[in-house]
Amino acid sequence: MRSGPPVDEKGISCIVCAFNEADRIRNILDVIVGHPALSEIIVVNDGSTDATADLLCSYPELRVLSHTPNRGKTYALSRGVAAARCEHLMLLDADLSGVTAADIDALAAPVMRGEAEVSISLRSNSLWIYRRLGLDFVSGERLVPRDLLRGAVEAMERLPRWGGEVFMNELIIRRGMRIAVVKWPRVVNIRKFRKAGLWHGTLAELGMIADAVSVLTPLGVVRQHLALLRLVNRPSLRARVRGWAERALS
């Protein structure tokens, strides 16, 4: 692991988990490397078998953690969390397209200004229902306090490959943390069928759903989404959610 230079511990550690993203990861690295809002950038190379490792070597500013074999995003994220040195963590997927420096600022701003404790992105290609509700509860782009996850590293290591976001959501709900939803209208993530082909990509997408359900149960998924919506830092949305919940229970 490259340890990197000293950092402002009051700042933001950015964590990017990557598996075979050599064709895409430059899109995000070219935006975040040198970004003034980020004190350090940690990239976890999750057992990549393509040219990801070689590409990362061309960015000396990064702290790179590598392991083999591929263990899945949640395990990779746990390693990044354990290594982070700053009080806040910005979590970003490696396959984003359309991200700008302004998007990074927008994701950081609500938390760093004290308006919320957590911020979560809402991408332009989030599922229609998420965009309609105003919250993508499995978004991989977030800003959270480090202490939310630092004590949960061992638990994260035991989670399914894609169980990290819903696990994190439960921690947020237990603490009653205020959430800011940050719209990223020009940002998309690359769907797995485009990366791995229709068959393997579809299986991977189904695997992500199965992992979320295995952590929560189907009813738990609905409950969690409603609980998160109640924490969104917009009074009008909170009122709408209370109305939906009351009608659903009546």
Language model region names:
Residues R2-P5, I173-S250:
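Hydrophobic helical membrane-anchoring modules
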Residues G11-S13, E40, F167:
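Cell-envelope/extracellular polymer assembly enzymes that use nucleotide-activated donors
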Residues N20-G34:
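Short, well-formed alpha-helical segments that are part of the catalytic scaffolds
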Residues I32-V33, D46-G47, R71:
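Conserved short acidic donor-positioning loop in nucleotide-sugar-dependent glycosyltransferases
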Residues S39, A53-A83, S119-L122:
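Conserved donor nucleotide-binding strand/loop of the catalytic core
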Residues N45-A53:
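A conserved acidic beta->alpha catalytic loop
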Residues L89:
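Short aromatic/hydrophobic "clamp" motif used to bind/position activated sugar donors
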Residues A101-L122:
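Conserved donor-nucleotide/metal-binding helix-loop-beta segment in metal-dependent transferases, i.e.
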